[in-house]
Regions:
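Positively charged n-region of N-terminal signal peptides that target proteins for export
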Residues: 1-5
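Bacterial N-terminal signal peptides
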Residues: 6-15
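N-terminal accessory beta-strand-rich subdomains and adjacent acidic, glycine-rich linkers
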Residues: 22-200
Length: 200
C-alpha cells in the first residue's frame, strides 16, 4: 500500500516540477519561462511569439578547495536543485537623471524570484571501532532573480545568509544564452580600470 501511494505521489509531483513558470513584460511582448529541468535551472525567452533564447541552463562553478564553509564538500551550483519558492511582483517608477539626453526615465518591469534548494548527503567521518556515525545532510539555497522589461530581461544570482554557503569563490559563471538565430551581440570590453571604451 505504501509503495502504491509513493508511486501515485511521484506521478502527481513529477509533472509539477517540470512545469515552467511564465513571466511576461508589462506590455506582454517579452515572455520568460523558467523551470528546473533534471535538477538544472533552465529558462527560455520569446518575443512577440517567436523564440529568442532556446532552453538555456543557469548556474555557477565554485573554485575547488577555496571556500570555508565548515565541513563542506566541494559541489558547484550547477545541478541537483529543486524549486523551493517562487515570488512575482511588478515595479514601476519614473526618475530624472542628473545628466543625459532624456529628462525622464521609466523603470517598469515584472519581477520573478526563484529560490532553489540543493540537498545531498556526505559520508560520515571514520569513527572508532564499533561506533556508528550517521550520514550528514547538506542543504544550500540560491535565488535567481529575473526582471522582465518591455525591451528585454536581466537576471542575477543572490546568496541568502546560510552556514552551508558561508564563504566561497566563483571560478566561472555558467549562464547560457542559446540564441535561436544568428544574432549580432553587443558587449563592453573587460577593461575594468576605465569607462572610456566604446561598446563593441
Amino acid at each position: 500500500m505504501k509503495t502504491g501511494l509513493q508511486l501515485l505521489l511521484s506521478l502527481i509531483v513529477a509533472p509539477l516540477t517540470m512545469m515552467a513558470t511564465e513571466v511576461k513584460s508589462p506590455n506582454g511582448n517579452v515572455v520568460l519561462n523558467f523551470t528546473v529541468e533534471d535538477g538544472r535551472p533552465t529558462y527560455t525567452l520569446d518575443y512577440k511569439g517567436k523564440a529568442v533564447v532556446l532552453p538555456s541552463h543557469l548556474g555557477l562553478e565554485l573554485a575547488k578547495d577555496k571556500h570555508a564553509s565548515m565541513g563542506m564538500e566541494e559541489r558547484s551550483l550547477l545541478e541537483g536543485f529543486t524549486l523551493a519558492k517562487e515570488e512575482t511582483s511588478e515595479f514601476d517608477e519614473t526618475w530624472q537623471p542628473v545628466w543625459g539626453e532624456t529628462r525622464d526615465i521609466r523603470n517598469h518591469y515584472n519581477e520573478y524570484a526563484a529560490t532553489l534548494s540543493q540537498e545531498w548527503q556526505s559520508a560520515p567521518p571514520k569513527g572508532t571501532r564499533g561506533q556508528r556515525l550517521a550520514f550528514r545532510r547538506h542543504e544550500r539555497h540560491i535565488i535567481i532573480r529575473f526582471r522582465v522589461y518591455d525591451d528585454g530581461i536581466g537576471f542575477r544570482y543572490e546568496f541568502p545568509q546560510q552556514t552551508e554557503l558561508n564563504y566561497f569563490l566563483i571560478q566561472e559563471e555558467k549562464s547560457e544564452f542559446a540564441m535561436a538565430g544568428d544574432h549580432t551581440a553587443w558587449w563592453l570590453p573587460g577593461d575594468y580600470d576605465t569607462q572610456e571604451q566604446e561598446t563593441q
